[in-house]
From Swiss-Prot:
The keyword Nucleotide-binding applies. It catalyses: 5-amino-1-(5-phospho-D-ribosyl)imidazole-4-carboxylate + L-aspartate + ATP = (2S)-2-[5-amino-1-(5-phospho-beta-D-ribosyl)imidazole-4-carboxamido]succinate + ADP + phosphate + 2 H(+). Keywords: ATP-binding, Ligase, Nucleotide-binding, Purine biosynthesis. InterPro entries: SAICAR_synt/ADE2_N, SAICAR_synt_PurC, SAICAR_synth, SAICAR_synthetase, SAICAR_synthetase_CS. Pathway: Purine metabolism; IMP biosynthesis via de novo pathway; 5-amino-1-(5-phospho-D-ribosyl)imidazole-4-carboxamide from 5-amino-1-(5-phospho-D-ribosyl)imidazole-4-carboxylate: step 1/2. Pfam families: SAICAR_synt. The gene is purC. This is Phosphoribosylaminoimidazole-succinocarboxamide synthase. It is an enzyme of class 6 (ligase). SUPFAM superfamilies: SAICAR synthase-like. It comes from Streptococcus pyogenes serotype M1. One of its GO terms (biological process) is 'de novo' IMP biosynthetic process.
């Protein structure tokens, strides 16, 4: 392992390794919102996110989804394939909530007849604006074929995740994915999947995700621990 920091993020730091095609991702005990405008250190959060994301990515790998995940190496570290991240947040919504409800003036909790896929341009200076396919092409981010792939793969991943979470009594409301190009130029799933980048509601409508922090609904690590234990039992 090497200790050369190559990326410092809000929730994760990334380091190089002896293998130029492999990175070490370290999950941090930090919760943020509004693109980092509010920050708070929460002991144990990094380890919980790392373990949850590792479990999800292991299941996705076994289900045939090509991801950057290699292995978990400690409670708050994992090894990943190095990718060239596509500057898009791909958001899929199964149920109205959050910014979607605010943007369109609809109540939270409405089940969408067909899940909606949205793109957001990853640019902190611009506050990650909501963009459409034409904007994506104008910005030269990806082409038509790659846009179609991102949407299709996100929908396929959604069906897998919805099924798994349903088995443990959780409703997958929405989530954000990030993809990147691997060393062969293939688009693969990257980043993480944890309650930091998805919404999960239990059967009583209780939030089991980062909204607990955003809305001051309780102890975040207690909620994440419940999600982890449910996934371990799956």
């Amino acid at each position: 392992m090497t200790n050369q920091l190559i990326y410092k993020g809000k929730a994760k730091d990334i380091y190089s390794t002896k293998d130029e095609n492999v990175i070490r991702t370290v999950y941090k005990d930090q919760a943020t919102m509004l693109n980092g405008a509010r920050k708070e250190t929460i002991d144990g959060k990094g380890a919980l996110n790392n373990q949850i994301s590792s479990l999800i990515f292991e299941k996705l790998n076994k289900a045939g989804v090509v991801t950057h995940y290699i292995e978990q190496i400690s409670k708050n570290e994992q090894l990943n394939k190095k990718v060239d991240i596509i500057p898009l947040e791909v958001v899929l919504r199964n149920v109205t909530a959050g910014s979607f409800s605010k943007r369109f003036g609809v109540e939270e909790g409405h089940v969408l007849e067909t899940p909606i896929v949205e793109f957001y341009y990853k640019n902190d200076d611009l506050d990650d604006p909501f963009i459409n396919d034409e904007h994506v092409k104008f910005l030269g981010i990806v082409n038509d074929e790659e846009i179609a792939y991102l949407k299709g793969e996100t929908r396929r991943i959604n069906e897998l995740l919805k099924g798994w979470f349903a088995q443990i009594g959780l409703n997958l409301i929405d989530f954000k994915l990030e993809f990147g190009f691997d060393q062969e130029g293939t688009i693969i799933l990257a980043d993480e999947f944890s309650p930091d980048n998805c919404r999960l509601w239990d059967k009583n409508g209780n939030h089991m995700d980062k909204d607990v922090f955003r809305r001051d609904l309780g102890n975040l690590t207690d909620v994440y621990q419940v999600v982890l234990e449910k996934l371990i039992a799956l």
